[in-house]
Amino acid sequence: MMMTKQKNTLAERLNIGDEVRELKLGSTFNPKNTSTAFHTIKYDFKPASVDTSRMATVDVGSNNQVTVIVPNSELALNVRLLIFGLTESSGVPHTVYKGNQREYAKECLMIYDKETGAITIEKLNHNIQVKKTRTEVTNKPVQLPAQSVPMNMGHQGQVLGTNGSVPPPMAQLAQGPLSGPGGKLENSTMRVSSKTKVSTGSRRNNIIDFKPRNSPMQQSSPSRPVVTHRSPQSAPAWDANNAQQTLPSIPMITDDDDFGLRAALHNGGQANISGSSTGSSSGQPDLYGSSSSSHMGKQRQAHGKRQQIHQRSSPPVQQQPHYQQQQQPNYGRAYNGASNYAQQQQPQPQQQRHSPHQQPHQQQHQRHSPQQQQQRHSPQQLQQQRPTSYGHSNNMPMDLDSSREHDLASQSVAQAAAVLEQQIGGALSASSSSSESDSSDSDSGSDSDDSTEDDRSMKEQQEQQQQQQLQHQQLQLQHQQIQQPAPHHQRHQQQQSQQHMNQLPNLGLGSISPSYNNHHNHQQPQPQPQQQQMSGVYASNGGFPNDLLQNDLQLSSNSSDDDD
C-alpha cells in the first residue's frame, strides 16, 4: 500500500523548483510611494449567490467604518424566484458586508508571478474584517469603476494590489476566494462565530407615530345665558373615521332654573317652564329673574335625574287664600317682628270677651259671603298677593337659599301660632261667656231659647260648610298633584300649614310652634308619607284632626243643651 506524501513546503505548494530565485521588494517599501497600497479583507460568510465575475465595491467611511457590497448573480436570483415563489421585488441583487479596519504594523505579502517566475514582497496597510448584514441594501446602486484597474493576482487568487499607497475611499477589488496572510482559503460555508455585533446603517427603526384621537371637548355654557331653551352638549357618537357627529340635544331644566320652576308652580302651571323663568299669566313681572350660573353637562344630567325623582315624590302646591295673604306680614321680617306682632295682637282676646255675641255674627257673615270662599281657590289672587322678598334671592347659592327658607318658615310658623293662640283664646272666652249668658237667660223666656237654638243651628251649618270646604280642597290638591309637580317642599308645606291653621274653627289647644318645628325639620326626607297623611296633618302639627274637631263641637253643643 503506497502512501502519498503531503505537500507541506511552500515550494511544493507553489510548484516552484529547487532553483534559486531573486526576491524583490515592492513599491510599498519605497518611502516616496503614494500610489500603491495593499489591504486584506476577511468576511464570515459568502453566500452561493455571489457573482464572482463582477466587481465589488468597498466604501471606507468615517471612524474606520467599512461597507463592502458584493453583487449577486442573476441566475441565483432566478433560482430563488422559482424555488421560494418570491416576486421580483423580493429578490436581493446585492450582498452587503459591514465592519471596521485597522492598520498593520509589520505584516507583508509575497506575490509570485507565474509568467516571469519573480517573487515580490509588499507591505500590508490595513486589515478589514466585515460581517454579512441581515438586511440587504436594495436601493444602493453598484458603483462601477470608470476605468479598469490592473490587478496582480497571486497563485491562489489573492488580491495583490491597487494603484494607491493609502487606502482609497472606494477600492475596486476583483472578486474571488479571499484569503488571509497565511494563505488559508475562506471559501468554506462554515460561519465564523464572533462576539462583536455590527450596526447596520441600512436598518431603520420605523417608529409609528400614534396620534391620539382628538375627541370634541364638552364646552361649558356661557356665563350670561340667553333666555332661550338650553340643552347640554351630548357626547359625540363613536365613528371609525373620527367624524365629529353629535346626537340631537334634548332641552333640560338645570339647577339654574329653580326660581323659574318655582314661579311656574305658583302661577298654577300657566307659566312656561324653560331655561329661564318668565312672568306669570296675569301680567305680573318676573320676581325672581333669570339664572346666571353655569354648570357642566354631567352636572346638568345628574340634576335632571334628581329633579325627575324629586317631582315624582313631591307634595302638591298648596294655594293660600286671599284673606290669609292680607293678614300675613312680609317674610323678610325678623323673629322679633313676629313676637312684636304677637304682643300687639294680645289685647284682641279681651275685646272678644266683652263681645261674646260678635263671633256668631261674624260666622254668619262668612257663611253668607261665597265670594270670599271662592277667593280661597283662585290662583289669580295668589299671584297678585305673592310676597316680594324672594326677588333678591336670584344670585344666592342653593344652600343659602334653603337655610333662609327654613328661617322664614320658622318665623311665619311662629307668627301663625301667635295668631292662632289669640283666636283660640278668644273663641274659648266667647264660648264660655255665651254658655254663661245662655244659662243665665234660660228662665227669661222663649226668646232666649230661640236665640240659642238659632246659634246651634248656625254652628252646625258652619261645621258642615267647613267640612265641605276641606273635602273640596283635598280634591283640588289631588288634581293639582297630577297636573303640576312641586320641587320645593318647604314653601308649599308652609303655605299648606298656614291655610289649615286659618281654616280651623275657633276651638283648640295651645301653641303649635314646637311640634310644627319638629315636624318641619323632618318633612324634607319624607315627602310621600306627609302627602298621604293629608287628613291627619292637624294631629302631626299639634292640632286636632277632623274627627276630633267634630267630636269637640258635638260635646260643646251637648254642654250648651245641658246648661239650658
Swiss-Prot record:
GO terms under biological process: positive regulation of DNA-templated transcription; transcription elongation by RNA polymerase II
Q: Where is this region: Disordered?
A: 179-255, 270-564
Which intervals carry biased composition (Low complexity)?
274-283, 315-329, 343-387, 409-420, 463-505, 523-533, 546-564
Membrane spanning stretches = none
Tagged with keyword Transcription: yes
Q: List compositional bias (Acidic residues) regions by residue number.
A: 438-453
Where is this gene product found? Answer: Nucleus
Q: Which InterPro entries match?
A: EAF_fam, Tscrpt_elong_fac_Eaf_N
Residue list for modification Phosphoserine: S215
Give the Basic residues compositional bias ranges: 297-309
Composition skew (Polar residues), residue ranges = 186-205
* Key words of the record: Activator, Developmental protein, Nucleus, Phosphoprotein, Transcription, Transcription regulation
Listed GO MF terms: transcription elongation factor activity
Protein name, UniProt field = Ell-associated factor Eaf
